[in-house]
Amino acid sequence: MNQEEITRQQFDRTAPAYSTASLFGRGQDLQWLVEAAHPSPDWQVLDVGCGAGHTTFALAPFVQQVIGVDLSAGMLAEAERNLSDRGLTNVWFQAAIATALPFADQQFDLVTCRFAAHHFSALEPALAEIHRVLKPKGQFLAVDVISPEDPELAHFINRIEQLRDPSHYWEWQLSQWHSAIAAVGMSLELLQQWRLPIDFEDWVSRQQTSPTAVTQLEELLDHAPLALQQSLAMTRAPQRTFQLWAALMRGVPVSASSPL
């Protein structure tokens, strides 16, 4: 089974939890993304990995049209259900994968991808497609969890993420984002970076992590080297928590970012 099929199956199963999760529906980064976009009423927008539609809906009041795409039928069903509650008339959802977007070259003023890229088995193929569908003066805004540059910490974080969620591939480091963006002809600007608080019980329940895997995760966290525990700001009481890293990034075609 390839990465896309693993991701599709995982989110078909867990989609309702993502529809209501405060991290995705009410995260401060959602407002940061909208503000960074400076949207215009005539814009065409594409939301890649739209999930339950939170980013799609946040942008819709400010632009002409937003299309949300996702590979999970379960997620798209949640998005359509959420759309019916909002009465928006400029939003569409359809099935698509990030590496084969069914749209014309240079069609969109803005492409977004929020908390989805860590499910991609490689950044470059998806970024190449995003670049292809962007207008020459368009922009790409991404929000995602990121790995620190420290290899030990990065591997530990991704180990626990993969144990909790089989569809998790890798929390890409900023250096990897920069390299992949440059390889497809865009430049990257880091707009915001912050610590993302994680409540362990919510984290595992949202993905319906098996009891066996939950026990393994607890053991990994409890027996992690002290330096890792401190870096992740781990707590055990009154509830188990830790902190990841997240970033808001802007990519623009090199021709658009170059001085005249």
Regions found by a protein language model. Give the residues of each.
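Short alpha-helix
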Residues: W170-V184
